[in-house]
From Swiss-Prot:
Its cofactor is Mg(2+); Mn(2+). Pathway: Isoprenoid biosynthesis; isopentenyl diphosphate biosynthesis via DXP pathway; isopentenyl diphosphate from 1-deoxy-D-xylulose 5-phosphate: step 1/6. It is an enzyme of class 1 (oxidoreductase). It comes from the Bacteria. This is 1-deoxy-D-xylulose 5-phosphate reductoisomerase. Its EC number is 1.1.1.267. Residues 370-380 have a biased composition (Basic and acidic residues). One of its GO terms (biological process) is isopentenyl diphosphate biosynthetic process, methylerythritol 4-phosphate pathway involved in terpenoid biosynthetic process. SUPFAM superfamilies: 1-deoxy-D-xylulose-5-phosphate reductoisomerase, C-terminal domain, Glyceraldehyde-3-phosphate dehydrogenase-like, C-terminal domain, NAD(P)-binding Rossmann-fold domains. It comes from Anaeromyxobacter dehalogenans (strain 2CP-1 / ATCC BAA-258). NADPH binds at T10, G11, S12, I13, G36, R37, N38, N121, E123, G202. Keywords: Isoprene biosynthesis, Manganese, Metal-binding, NADP, Oxidoreductase.
């Protein structure tokens, strides 16, 4: 029986992780849950899984949960609450799925407590990947990726010598706007950009998929997770989302992981590792699929992913600043305060204006991300009030 804590339990990944737990009651016991403000969903989870401790983002939500939670469940709040769940002494595995930079402190706490981590929070690696991997190595902690692409790379590396890797190849669906002409992108609405063809995800990551910023952030994540320089990490657009990513070896051989588009696959791989668990999911029928297509990404239409390579080139706090700027720009787009194409423009402006410093602590990484967010908000506001060109 593996005792697990799930951070971000009411989000998309957290809900699917609990679905996996529910399928294997003899394998998993939930000891802790951390959520945002969705008290009704968290209460449903508490009643079903009976965790010992839960946390929500603020005290108001905590009071609402305490009023209805069954006896025996401790209810905490804020960052300190999420950290307590992540480092709970009874947890033998922590799934880190709190979205955005908000998940960094709890992810770091799990590592410091010596817990194996299933990492679904890519921003932790983007903000402080070098630091976290160093701490994980010092603590002897395994970090198992939950992003489908990084899970695919992890699976494609099993049994191989890391020194024989030539490059990593991350696949991208291309998002809902893959075939949209460049001239139309500036007028794309949030509703259109949120219609992902293959995956069901939260709003922020879906917009990042549409801009290809998500793939850029995954390049940063892969750079630290697998210790491969960005010059040896490539992106290829693969609309079917069947090949989840690939590893090319020095002899020219490519090993890939294929599967249907269902996050319960990589979630169960991380949670059950080193064993695989039988999932009642539809099989991948390659005969019916008929073909797999691949194409290079188009930096002219979707320049956002190139900013991630630039951030890695700059080093230090640059990736954290880029991540924060993207969070603010995407929020502005969803609120109709900036256009789709302005997301990348704002992020590029913030990144190039930033004075880079080495990342020496989690708090410094978070401060850099917050700086990027503030600078992006300023630029969105300035653009909104700029006179129209004649």
């Amino acid at each position: 029986m593996k005792r697990v804590a799930i951070l971000g339990s009411t989000g998309s990944i957290g809900v699917q992780a609990l679905d996996v737990v529910g399928r294997f009651p003899d394998r998993f016991e939930v000891v802790g849950l951390a959520a945002g403000r969705n008290a009704p969903r968290l209460l449903e989870q508490i009643r079903r899984f009976r965790p010992r401790v839960v946390s929500v983002c603020d005290e108001a939500a905590a009071r609402a949960v305490r009023a209805e939670a069954p006896p025996g469940t401790e209810v905490l709040s804020g960052d300190a609450g999420a950290v307590a769940v992540a480092s709970h002494p009874d947890a033998a595995f922590v799934l880190a799925a709190i979205s955005g930079g908000a998940g960094l402190r709890s992810t770091a706490a799990a590592i410091e407590a010596g817990k194996p981590v299933g990492l679904a929070n890519k921003e932790s690696m983007v903000l402080a990947g070098e630091l976290l991997m160093a701490r994980a190595a010092a603590k002897g902690v395994a970090i198992l990726p939950v992003d489908s692409e990084h899970s695919a790379i992890h699976q494609s590396l099993v049994g191989h010598n890391r020194g024989e890797v030539r490059r990593l190849i991350l696949t991208a669906s291309g998002g809902p706007l893959r075939c949209t002409p460049e001239a139309e992108l500036a007028t794309v609405t949030p509703e259109r950009a949120l219609k992902h063809p293959n995956w069901s995800m939260g709003d922020k990551i879906t917009i990042d998929s549409a801009t290809l910023m998500n793939k850029g952030l995954e390049v940063i994540e892969a750079r630290w997770l697998f210790g491969v320089e960005q010059q040896r990490i490539d992106i290829v657009v693969h609309p079917e989302s069947v090949v989840h990513s690939m590893v090319e070896y020095v002899d020219g051989s490519i090993v890939a992981q294929l599967g249907i588009s269902d996050m319960r696959g990589p979630i169960s791989y991380a949670m059950g590792h080193p064993e695989r668990m039988p999932l009642d999911l539809p099989p991948l029928d390659l005969g019916r699929l008929g073909k797999l297509t691949f194409e290079p990404p188009d930096p002219a239409r979707f320049p956002a992913y190139t900013l991630a390579y630039r951030a890695l080139e700059l080093g230090g706090t640059a990736p954290a600043v880029l991540s924060g700027a993207d969070e603010a720009a995407v929020a502005a787009f969803l609120a109709r305060r900036c256009s789709f194409t302005e997301i990348a423009e704002v992020c590029a402006d913030v990144l190039e204006a930033h004075v880079v410093e080495p990342v020496r602590s989690v708090e410094q990484a978070l401060a850099a991300s917050e700086h990027g967010r503030r600078e992006a908000e300023k630029r969105v506001g300035a653009r909104a009030h700029a006179p129209a060109s004649r």
